């Protein structure tokens, strides 16, 4: 199994470190030819507008869309989740390039600025009974989950923070910033 981590911007190094810790040597994906080598792709947190623009510049939007869910499982964390959503609210003026692969609506920076970042327990039965500690940094919020897409993770107040659609996974938090590797292991099973 080959796992790529989109390494254009954001916290790709942290995802790579978790993958190595669980015995997977990741490929840092910066070019379309590297994308062709992977069966799974993690789109990390960072700045969604910047990552979207870089995907456009490096001509990777269409190759990712063409393979998504078929021979390419994709997991987006935070900014990566924004890029996977079919509807994004609170975009910068003029919009932003997205992959628009998952039937969900997501709101950018829903919890406020960097100063409003927080940690909170997450219920995610798909990875086990024990709550997961979620790290939310300028995090988006999943507003709604549409047909074919299912909510798989929640905050205590019922807010959806993780969704799955076939071989596509979106988390609005950063599992790579904790010692808990259960979401990474889940992704390897998609």
From Swiss-Prot:
GO terms for cellular component: cytosol; glutaminase complex. Its EC number is 4.3.3.6, 3.5.1.2. It comes from the Bacteria. L-glutamine binds at residues 46-48, 108, 137-138. PROSITE patterns: PDXT_SNO_1, PDXT_SNO_2. Catalyzes the hydrolysis of glutamine to glutamate and ammonia as part of the biosynthesis of pyridoxal 5'-phosphate. The resulting ammonia molecule is channeled to the active site of PdxS. In the presence of PdxS, forms a dodecamer of heterodimers. Only shows activity in the heterodimer. Belongs to the glutaminase PdxT/SNO family. This is Pyridoxal 5'-phosphate synthase subunit PdxT. It comes from Chloroflexus aurantiacus (strain ATCC 29366 / DSM 635 / J-10-fl).
């Amino acid at each position: 199994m080959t796992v790529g981590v989109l390494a254009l911007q954001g916290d790709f190094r942290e995802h790579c470190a978790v993958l190595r810790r669980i015995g997977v040597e990741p490929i840092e994906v910066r070019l379309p030819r590297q994308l062709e080598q992977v069966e799974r792709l993690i789109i990390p947190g960072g700045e969604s507008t910047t990552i979207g623009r870089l995907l456009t510049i490096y001509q990777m939007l269409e190759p990712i869309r063409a393979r998504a869910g078929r021979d390419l499982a994709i997991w987006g964390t935070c900014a990566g989740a924004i890029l996977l959503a079919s509807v994004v609210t609170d975009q910068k003026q003029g919009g932003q390039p997205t992959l628009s692969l998952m039937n969900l609506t997501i709101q950018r920076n829903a919890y406020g600025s960097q100063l409003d970042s927080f940690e909170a327990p997450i219920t995610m039965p798909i990875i086990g009974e024990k709550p997961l500690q979620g790290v939310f940094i300028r995090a988006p919020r999943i507003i709604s989950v549409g047909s074919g897409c299912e909510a798989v993770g929640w905050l205590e107040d019922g807010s959806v923070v993780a969704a799955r659609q076939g071989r596509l996974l979106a988390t609005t938090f950063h599992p790579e910033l904790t010692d808990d590797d259960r979401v990474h292991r889940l992704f390897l099973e998609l």
